[in-house]
Amino acid sequence: MKPTPELLVVMPVYNESASINHVLDGWLAELDGSGCDYRLLAIEDGSTDNTFALLCQWKDERPERLEVRTRENRGHGQTCLEGYREAVARGIPYVLQIDSDGQSLPVFFGDFWKLRKTHDVIYGARSRKDGWQRIIASAVLRLALRVLEGVDCVDANVPYRLMSCEACAKVMARVPQEISLANVALAVMLRREKGIRHGAVPIDFPPRFGGEPSVPMHRFLAKAVEIFRQLRGMRPQP
């Protein structure tokens, strides 16, 4: 293994004791079989259950591949940004973000990885099976981004995306540290940036393996309203 891997997998984790063993077992097996040199960075975001203890057990078993850190709770978006910034700072060519609830299925990773040379940003295009409310929320978000921001993002909030760190570095400094729904903001900034090649991979998106969403639907809607206010302040000046 090289000191600097080819891929950093960023996985925010919050109260996922019901799913984390299943998720790590599947993802480590898939990544091992892919042939890429990777590290999986699990950022434990102040869980109140025994998630961190389970992560530490996994790290003891796979120290060469799994990195674990814990911190006070700051939310999913800020956890993702922390991982992206670390990938850029370490000079790692690619960063993959997945979630720890079992909805990001490892079986689709190979389809993403094949596109990395011809696309700078690759999003999962979800065939959602986790409820009509989430389906409507995704559709409304895409429409609102088209109308209000003038960008078409396939699935701006999808927790399954492969990005080149070179592309991320071009826009990361313009994404505020405390912004709500940080993945949405990053997707918008990347879409606005000239020269970045975008792609998508159709993915199944099953119900959560266990636990509860870190952002319930009513809070997601409130955050969506807030992020459009924040995006307005991030628009390029004429």
Residue ranges, per PLM feature:
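Cell-envelope/extracellular polymer assembly enzymes that use nucleotide-activated donors
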Residues: 6-8, 39, 185
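Short beta-strand-to-loop acidic/aromatic patch adjacent to the donor-nucleotide binding site
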Residues: 92-103
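A conserved acidic beta->alpha catalytic loop
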Residues: 44-53, 102
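Conserved donor NDP-sugar-binding/catalytic core segment of glycosyltransferases
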Residues: 110-132
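Short, well-formed alpha-helical segments that are part of the catalytic scaffolds
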Residues: 16-31
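Donor nucleotide-sugar binding loop of glycosyltransferases
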Residues: 16-19, 47, 76
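Conserved donor nucleotide-binding strand/loop of the catalytic core
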Residues: 41, 52-90
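Conserved catalytic loops of nucleotide-sugar-dependent glycosyltransferases that act on lipid-linked
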Residues: 75-80, 84, 103, 131-237
